[in-house]
Amino acid sequence: MAKMSALSIFAIFIILVLVIFEIPEIEAHDSECLKEYGGDVGFGFCAPKIFPTICYRNCQKDKGANGGKCLWGEGGKVKCLCDFCSNESFNQFISLT
């Protein structure tokens, strides 16, 4: 029975190590997917009433991306991030709050 318990503990330890080493790869994947379109693009580029946003359309047209997401910062600053991995048009806004 003690042999089975030691084997179970070893298996759990190996699984935890694999999970811990996998986490940085997931974070790096996001940075590879989202590339900035170019500086503070302003409110009109990401106006919520326009669907899909100009950011989304221009990222597809100008950069060859699958789409674009708007990142709203403090003081009304807006950045457009071109998304090269996902083409979900329903999730176009990222909030820092």
From Swiss-Prot:
Disulfide bond found in the keyword field: yes
UniProt keyword annotations, A-Z: Antimicrobial, Disulfide bond, Fungicide, Plant defense, Secreted, Signal
Signal peptide, first to last residue: 1-28
CC annotations in GO: extracellular region; secretory vesicle
Outcome reported for the amino acid change (mutating A6V): In strain: cv. Cvi-1, cv. Fe-1a, cv. Nd-1 and cv. Wei-0
Record site feature (Reactive bond), residues: K49, I50
Main location (coarse class): secreted
SUPFAM superfamilies: Scorpion toxin-like
Location relative to the cell: Secreted
Disulfide pairings: C33-C85, C46-C70, C55-C80, C59-C82
Alphabetical list of Pfam families matching this protein: Toxin_3
Superkingdom per UniProt: Eukaryota
GO BP annotation list: defense response to fungus; killing of cells of another organism
A molecular function (GO) term: sodium channel inhibitor activity
Consequence when changing I14T: In strain: cv. Cvi-1, cv. Fe-1a, cv. Nd-1 and cv. Wei-0
Family membership noted in the UniProt record: Belongs to the DEFL family. Protease inhibitor I18 (RTI/MTI-2) subfamily.
Descriptive protein name: Defensin-like protein 196
Organism whose genome encodes this protein: Arabidopsis thaliana
Organism taxonomic ancestry: Eukaryota, Viridiplantae, Streptophyta, Embryophyta, Tracheophyta
Gene behind this protein: ATTI4
